[in-house]
Amino acid sequence: MLAIICALALNRAIGYNNKLLYYLSADLKRFKSLTTGNTIIMGRRTFESLPKGALPNRRNIVLSRRKDAAFEGAEVFASLDEALAATKPGEDVFVLGGESVYAEAMSRADRLYLTHVEATPEAADAFFPEINEADWSLQHTERHDADEKNVVPFTFADYVRQGEKK
């Protein structure tokens, strides 16, 4: 299974200056629960934005066109095609971004695990690609109000590509 996981604002914004726009405790817990024990694929800048480097208990794959690229705790591939070819059939693989990696993976993904943040940031320079609603079937939603650990309301939304099994 190839899944995309992302938190996006009302205007599809996902980041600014190579940082997340919102730090939502429940979203981070969900992210950890879904990705732990699985393979994660991300672009170089996304990897470099991780405060502690490679995420533990996951196979970290970084996409970089630099032939000499090396990132501690991660495997490096030049393209999404090469990275996917290095995964096992039936393996759960999650794409973590950034913007261009999401755009490339969108046509191949089987599932979307999205957090729809009910806010629009003042500034953003990275955006999630348009979602063609006809391609996706909404399987589950879970709304969360803002609270002391989550500064804005948001909704978890899980989608399966039309024609795929649940």
What are these regions (language model features)?
Residues 5-39, 44-166:
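Flexible, gly/pro- and Lys/Arg-enriched active-site loops
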